[in-house]
Amino acid sequence: MPKMKTDRGVAKRFKKTANGFKRKQAHLRHILTKKSTKRKRHLRAKCLVAKVDVPAIARQLPYA
């Protein structure tokens, strides 16, 4: 059986941790002037992927 392919887009966006997968938060690319400094600071923090989405990401990262 051939090696399974890793989804490269998913590999760049998610990192496997002991508690699941961590990801960057959205809403920090553009239209930043109307967002408060506090909101932008909190959006910089990484967060965990929802439990319901973990199996799909795990399928796309077979060697993670």
From Swiss-Prot:
SUPFAM superfamilies (UniProt xref): L35p-like
Pfam families in UniProt: Ribosomal_L35p
Alphabetized Gene3D superfamilies for the sequence: 4.10.410.60
Annotated keywords: Ribonucleoprotein, Ribosomal protein
GO terms (BP aspect): translation
A GO-annotated cellular component: cytosolic large ribosomal subunit
Domain of life: Bacteria
GO function term, MF aspect, one: structural constituent of ribosome
Record family assignment: Belongs to the bacterial ribosomal protein bL35 family.
Annotated protein name in UniProt: Large ribosomal subunit protein bL35
Species name: Shewanella amazonensis (strain ATCC BAA-1098 / SB2B)
Lineage start: Bacteria, Pseudomonadati, Pseudomonadota, Gammaproteobacteria, Alteromonadales
